[in-house]
């Protein structure tokens, strides 16, 4: 459902477990497509949705719950609509602490922490 939300219903992901191998199918408007056929923006949405989907599966299967998600530079490959939809999805998730690492992305509903490095010392500053 994550990819359907990120792509306004155009794409969906299917996870198939064969033995110990997890196969991921990308469906574009009802037809299976290869990942190489995707644009960089579509590829970014597929990657992000796959990460969120696997995290959810692991939470269902695991006895201990993962409540931490770090997304490093995922916003750079998403268009403005994709960024907004991802923030909406993340804000709806329950019991998760999400950190989005980005050099360019800002959102009014997200708290911002600036990290600067001077003389080998990193400083954190919350806004």
Regions found by a protein language model. Give the residues of each.
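Terminal ABC-like ATPase head and other globular end-domains that cap long coiled-coil arms
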Residues: 1-127
């Amino acid at each position: 459902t994550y990819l359907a939300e990120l792509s306004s219903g155009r794409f969906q992901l299917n996870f198939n477990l064969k033995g110990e191998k997890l196969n991921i199918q990308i469906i574009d408007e009802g037809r299976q497509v290869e990942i190489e056929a995707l644009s960089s923006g579509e590829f970014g949405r597929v990657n992000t949705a796959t990460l969120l989907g696997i995290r959810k599966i692991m939470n269902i299967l695991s006895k201990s719950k993962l409540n931490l998600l770090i997304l490093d530079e995922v916003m750079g490959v998403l268009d403005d609509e994709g960024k907004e939809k991802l923030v909406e999805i993340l804000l709806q998730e329950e019991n998760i602490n999400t950190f989005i690492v980005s050099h360019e992305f800002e959102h009014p509903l997200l708290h911002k922490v600036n990290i600067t490095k001077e003389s080998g010392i990193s400083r954190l500053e919350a806004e």
